[in-house]
C-alpha cells in the first residue's frame, strides 16, 4: 500500500485530488493543512456556501462524478507513478454547491458542532491517523468493507448515514432465565382418610374405650375444642370431626419370615433383642397421652421388666421413645444426642428426660450443632408490650461464661425487678459495646448478683442489638429463683445453677442461638421470662423409621415399611405462662406434603383437624388448648426438674414404593462349602429415597457366622469378629454421594470352618441420618402467638434385613 506513495509536495498523505475533492482529513490538527471549506486550521468564520454544490448521490450516499460516473471504481486511493501535476491538468472539476433552502436551514442548522460531527462520516484514509479530541469519534461507521473505505464521501451533513446501534431486545433474553418458578407441590393426590385402622400392630389396649376394633371415637374427649384464632381469616371454621381410631389387624408380609429367624436372637449386645410377638403386643399398649396417674413422659426412676427387655444393652445412653411399628418395630438405634430416658423404639430428637450421672452421656454437644437457622422475622418487634430482656450467651460463650443467661441486673428498659431479687442497675439495650462477662471461677458456679452476664460482642450467633430492635428473649434460661413470670417488666435473672456435673445436658435452639440448660438443679423449672403478648417458642421434630427386607438381588422382592411421628416440644416455663394467661391463643399448624402419608393418627386428646379441606397436599390441625394446658401441668408436677416437655402429636405411615424408598439398597450372596464360606454384601446409597440427600451415619453391618469359624482368610474392608457370639461386624462412619464410588461398595469375607458348612443368616444393618426425612413432610405455623424455634428432621433404620 505504501509503495505507491509519492514524495509529498503540497498534499497530505499523498491522496490524489481525483479521489477526494476535499482536502485530507486524516490529520486535522496539523498546521498548514487547509480545512475542507478552504479556511486555515482553527478558523471558524463565515463559510462561503458558493463553493459548495449539491452532488448527485447514489443509493449508498456516495457522490457521482459529473464526467465519469463510476470512474473511481477500480481505482486506488494511493498515487500512481504519474505526477500529480499532470493528472490535475487532465482532471479539473468545477463544483458549485446550491445554497440550502429555508426549510432545510430550519431542519439542519449548520452549527459548528454539527459540522464537526458530519466530518466524521467521511471515509478515513488507511494512513496512520491521530484523532483529535475535538472530533467526535462516535459517528464513524466502523463496519465498512474495504471497497467502501476506499470510496470518498462528501462532507455535506447527512445524518441518515450515521450508524446507530439498535438497542438490545430484552425480551430475547427471557429464554435464558428459564420458565417461572413452579409450585413445589404440584402433584395432587387423593386426600388420605384419617379413619384408617391402626398401623402400630395389634395388641390389647389399655383404654377400655378401645376394646372394640371398630369403635368410633370422636376427639377431643375433654373440653370442646376452641375455635381457631380470630386473626387468621384464611382458616375456615372448624368442627370437631370424629375419627375412627382403633387397633387394626394388618400384618406385614414378612412377619412370618422375620420372626422365624433364630439366628438374630443372639444380637442383643449390639442392636437389642428382636421384638417377639409378646413384646410387640406389650409395646402396642403404649398409646397416646391420657390424663391418668401414669405420665406419658414415663418418669419412673427405675426400669420396668418390660423396659429392661426392650432396652438395648449396647446403647443405654441413646434410648428410643416411640411405639413399635408392628412386626417391623425397630430396635433402638444409635439415637441423636440427648439425655437418657425410658426406652422406646425410635429415639426422639428432643428428649426431655432427666440426665443420669454419667459424663459420657453428655458428650453430645459439638460444634456441628451450631447452625443458625433463624429467620429475620424473629427479630422484629412483634406484639411486644415491653421489650424483653437481652438473650443469654450462645453456646461458645456459655462454656466459659458464668451462665446461660444474663445477670440479675440485666434489663432493657426501666422497670421493677422481680420480687425475689433486689433491684440492680440496668443495662440499656442501645449500648453496642457492653462490658464482657467475667470469667467463670471453677469453684463458684453462680454469677454474683449485680454483674452483667451478657455483652460478649464477638458472640457468633447473637443478632446485633439496636435500640429499634429489642433483643430476643431467653426462653429457657435458668433463674436464680423460682419467681413468677407474670410480670411483663420482670428482668432476666438467669444464672448457672449448682450442678454436680459441669457438662451441659441439653441444648435449646431459639432465634438463631443455642442455649445450654442444666439438669439436677434444685431451683425448679426454668421460668419463661416474657410478656403476655410475646410469641411462645415451640420446637417440632419429625422422626421416621424405615423397615426393609431384601431377598437376594431381586428388587421386586423387597418389602418396605416406613413409619414416623411428629412431636412438639414446649419449654418448661410455658406452664407458668399458661397459669397467668388462662386463655392463650390456639396453636394451629399445617403439615405440608400430607398426601405422601398413608395412615395418619392424630393425638385424639390434643389435636383436631378439618376433613373438608380441598388441598390434599396440606392438612391443618389445631390443638385443644385446655387439654394441652392440663397435660403440661400434670407433667410439670410429676417432673419438676424437666426442662422440656415432649408431646406426641401425629403418628403416620409413609407411602412406600418398594426398593426405591430405601435409602440403602442391599444384596447378600452366600457360598457355603464344608470347609469354607464366602460372603459378599453389596450396598448402594439411594438419593431418590430422600427429599434432601443427606449422609447415612454410623452404618453397621452385622452377620452371624456359624459352622465353627477357625480363621478369617480375607475381610475387605477390615471387620471385627466376635468369636464367642460368632458374628462379624463392619462399621462405616458414613455413606453418601461424597463417598467412594458415590456410595456404592461391597463387603467381602472368607471363613475357614471346622464344623461346616455354614447356614446363611440374615444381614442386619443399622444407620441414622439427620437433616431430612423419607416422607418429605414439613410443618408451618398458622396464626400468631407462637413461633418455631427449631424444626428437626431425622430418620433411622428399624428392622433393616437382607437375606440370601
Swiss-Prot record:
Residues modified as Phosphoserine: 54, 80-81, 83, 125, 127, 132, 145, 212, 241, 263, 276, 292, 295, 348, 375, 462
Keywords (A to Z) from UniProt: Coated pit, Endocytosis, Membrane, Phosphoprotein
Keyword Calcium (UniProt): no
Bilayer topology: Peripheral membrane protein
Pfam families associated with the record: muHD
Residues annotated as domain MHD: 535-803
Record region (Necessary and sufficient to mediate interaction with CANX): 625-804
Matches recorded under Gene3D superfamilies: Mu homology domain, subdomain B
Compositionally biased spans, kind Basic and acidic residues: 16-34, 289-309, 354-369
UniProt region (Disordered), positions on chain: 1-90, 124-181, 199-254, 289-500
One GO term describing the cellular component: clathrin-coated vesicle
UniProt protein name: SH3-containing GRB2-like protein 3-interacting protein 1
Organism for this UniProt entry: Pongo abelii (Sumatran orangutan)
Amino acid at each position: 500500500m505504501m509503495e505507491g506513495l509519492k514524495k509529498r509536495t503540497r498534499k497530505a498523505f499523498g491522496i490524489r485530488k481525483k479521489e477526494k475533492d476535499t482536502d485530507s482529513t486524516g490529520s486535522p490538527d496539523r498546521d498548514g493543512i487547509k480545512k475542507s471549506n478552504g479556511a486555515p486550521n482553527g478558523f471558524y468564520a463565515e463559510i462561503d456556501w458558493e463553493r459548495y454544490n449539491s452532488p448527485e448521490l447514489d443509493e449508498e450516499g456516495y457522490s457521482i462524478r459529473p464526467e465519469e460516473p463510476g470512474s473511481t471504481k477500480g481505482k486506488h486511493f494511493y498515487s500512481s507513478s504519474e505526477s500529480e501535476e499532470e493528472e490535475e491538468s487532465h482532471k479539473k472539476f468545477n463544483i458549485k454547491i446550491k445554497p440550502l433552502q429555508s426549510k432545510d436551514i430550519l431542519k439542519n442548522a449548520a452549527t459548528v458542532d454539527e459540522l464537526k460531527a458530519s466530518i466524521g462520516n467521511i471515509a478515513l484514509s488507511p494512513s496512520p491517523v491521530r484523532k483529535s479530541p475535538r472530533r467526535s469519534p462516535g459517528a464513524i461507521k466502523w463496519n465498512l468493507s474495504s471497497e467502501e473505505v476506499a470510496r470518498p464521501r462528501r462532507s455535506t451533513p447527512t445524518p441518515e448515514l450515521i450508524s446507530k446501534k439498535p438497542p438490545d431486545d430484552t425480551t430475547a433474553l427471557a429464554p435464558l432465565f428459564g420458565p417461572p418458578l413452579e409450585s413445589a407441590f404440584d402433584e395432587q393426590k387423593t386426600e388420605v382418610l384419617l379413619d384408617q385402622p391402626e398401623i402400630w400392630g395389634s395388641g390389647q389396649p389399655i383404654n377400655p374405650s378401645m376394646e372394640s376394633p371398630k369403635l368410633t371415637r370422636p376427639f377431643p374427649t375433654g373440653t370442646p375444642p376452641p375455635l381457631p384464632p380470630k386473626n387468621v381469616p384464611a382458616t375456615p371454621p372448624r368442627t370437631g370431626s370424629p375419627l375412627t381410631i382403633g387397633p387394626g389387624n394388618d400384618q406385614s408380609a414378612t412377619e412370618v419370615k422375620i420372626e422365624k429367624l433364630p439366628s438374630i436372637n443372639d444380637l442383643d449386645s449390639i442392636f437389642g433383642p428382636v421384638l417377639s410377638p409378646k413384646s410387640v403386643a406389650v409395646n402396642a399398649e403404649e398409646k397416646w397421652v391420657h390424663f391418668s396417674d401414669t405420665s406419658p413422659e414415663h418418669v419412673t426412676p427405675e426400669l420396668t421388666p418390660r423396659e429392661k427387655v426392650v432396652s438395648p444393652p449396647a446403647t443405654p445412653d441413646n434410648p428410643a421413645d416411640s411405639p413399635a411399628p408392628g412386626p417391623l418395630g425397630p430396635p433402638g438405634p444409635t439415637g441423636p444426642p440427648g439425655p437418657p430416658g425410658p426406652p422406646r423404639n425410635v429415639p426422639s430428637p428432643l428428649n426431655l428426660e432427666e440426665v443420669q450421672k454419667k459424663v459420657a452421656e453428655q458428650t453430645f454437644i459439638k460444634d456441628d450443632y451450631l447452625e443458625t437457622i433463624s429467620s429475620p422475622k424473629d427479630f422484629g418487634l412483634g406484639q411486644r408490650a415491653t421489650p424483653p430482656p437481652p438473650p443469654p450467651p450462645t453456646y461458645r460463650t456459655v462454656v466459659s461464661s458464668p451462665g446461660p443467661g444474663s445477670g440479675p441486673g440485666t434489663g432493657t428498659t426501666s422497670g421493677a425487678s422481680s420480687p425475689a431479687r433486689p433491684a440492680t442497675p440496668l443495662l440499656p439495650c442501645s449500648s453496642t459495646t457492653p462490658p464482657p462477662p467475667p470469667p467463670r471461677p471453677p469453684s463458684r458456679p453462680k454469677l454474683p448478683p449485680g454483674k452483667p452476664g451478657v455483652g460478649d460482642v464477638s458472640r457468633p450467633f447473637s443478632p446485633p442489638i439496636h435500640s429499634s430492635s429489642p433483643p430476643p428473649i431467653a426462653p429457657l434460661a435458668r433463674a436464680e429463683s423460682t419467681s413468677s413470670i407474670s410480670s411483663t417488666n420482670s428482668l432476666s435473672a438467669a444464672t448457672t445453677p449448682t450442678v454436680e456435673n459441669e457438662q451441659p445436658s441439653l441444648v435449646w435452639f431459639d432465634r438463631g442461638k443455642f442455649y445450654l440448660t442444666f439438669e439436677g438443679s434444685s431451683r425448679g423449672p426454668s421460668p419463661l421470662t416474657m410478656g403476655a403478648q410475646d410469641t411462645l417458642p415451640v420446637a417440632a421434630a419429625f422422626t421416621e423409621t424405615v423397615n426393609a427386607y431384601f431377598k437376594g438381588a431381586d428388587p421386586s422382592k423387597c418389602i418396605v415399611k416406613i413409619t414416623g411421628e411428629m412431636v412438639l416440644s414446649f419449654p418448661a416455663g410455658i406452664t407458668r405462662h399458661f397459669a397467668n394467661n388462662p386463655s392463650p391463643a390456639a396453636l394451629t399448624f399445617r403439615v405440608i406434603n400430607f398426601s405422601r402419608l398413608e395412615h395418619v393418627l392424630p393425638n385424639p386428646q390434643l389435636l383436631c383437624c378439618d376433613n373438608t379441606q380441598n388441598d390434599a397436599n396440606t392438612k391443618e390441625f389445631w390443638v385443644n388448648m385446655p387439654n394441652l394446658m392440663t397435660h403440661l401441668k400434670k407433667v410439670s408436677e410429676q417432673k419438676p426438674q424437666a426442662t422440656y416437655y415432649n408431646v406426641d402429636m401425629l403418628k403416620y405411615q409413609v407411602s412406600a414404593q418398594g426398593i426405591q424408598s430405601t435409602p440403602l439398597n442391599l444384596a447378600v450372596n452366600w457360598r457355603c462349602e464344608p470347609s469354607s464360606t464366602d460372603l459378599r454384601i453389596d450396598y448402594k446409597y439411594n438419593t431418590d429415597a430422600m427429599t434432601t440427600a443427606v449422609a447415612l451415619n454410623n452404618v453397621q453391618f452385622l452377620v452371624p457366622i456359624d459352622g465353627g469359624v477357625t480363621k478369617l482368610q480375607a475381610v475387605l474392608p477390615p471387620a471385627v469378629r466376635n468369636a464367642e457370639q460368632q458374628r462379624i461386624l463392619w462399621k462405616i462412619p458414613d455413606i453418601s454421594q461424597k463417598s467412594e464410588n458415590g456410595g456404592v461398595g461391597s463387603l467381602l469375607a472368607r471363613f475357614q470352618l471346622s464344623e461346616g458348612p455354614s447356614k446363611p443368616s440374615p444381614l442386619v444393618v443399622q444407620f441414622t441420618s439427620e437433616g431430612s426425612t423419607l416422607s418429605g413432610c414439613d410443618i408451618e405455623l398458622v396464626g400468631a402467638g407462637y413461633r418455631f424455634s427449631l424444626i428437626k428432621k431425622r430418620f433411622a433404620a428399624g428392622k433393616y434385613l437382607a437375606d440370601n
